[in-house]
């Protein structure tokens, strides 16, 4: 009986704390100035639930952002203003890994609405099954609102690599980026 009462008390306490915390977070973040980064990976690929978003939910996400006080942050502006204090509410959209489903599902929406984003690309899987091609990546990077970002070569857990292996991975990606798109992306997203 004592254990049941203690468990009930803990449950009620946690419930009340979380209710207050959520209310306090809403009050706090509604006045926040700065950048929120929202990261996506796969689109309409239900076989990968941990990294997938259904396209109707993605569209809803974009509509919520458009109707909020936040504005989309163009990656080129973000790059220039990186070290400056952020005085406006901004959303930075990022897409990791260059999956083909991004190109087929989300890219047409972002292109139509001219919504800025960063596409972080690991060079090793490009063109393989389920991934974008270099022509598709170049198309995104050549747009006014899509920016290509660096995501390593292998997309391995770089923390498990030696310093020399880490440097070789990045240098290999740099060389491929230069060959395929003509430049090395300035923005880097650490894999995992």
Could you say what each language-model-derived stretch is?
Residues 96-97:
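Noncatalytic alpha-helical scaffolds and linker/capping helices
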Residues 33, 38-48, 87-91, 100-192:
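Metal-dependent polysaccharide deacetylase catalytic core of the NodB/CE4 family, i.e.
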Residues 5-15:
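Bacterial N-terminal signal peptides
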Residues 16-91:
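N-terminal pre-catalytic segment of deacetylase/amide-hydrolase enzymes
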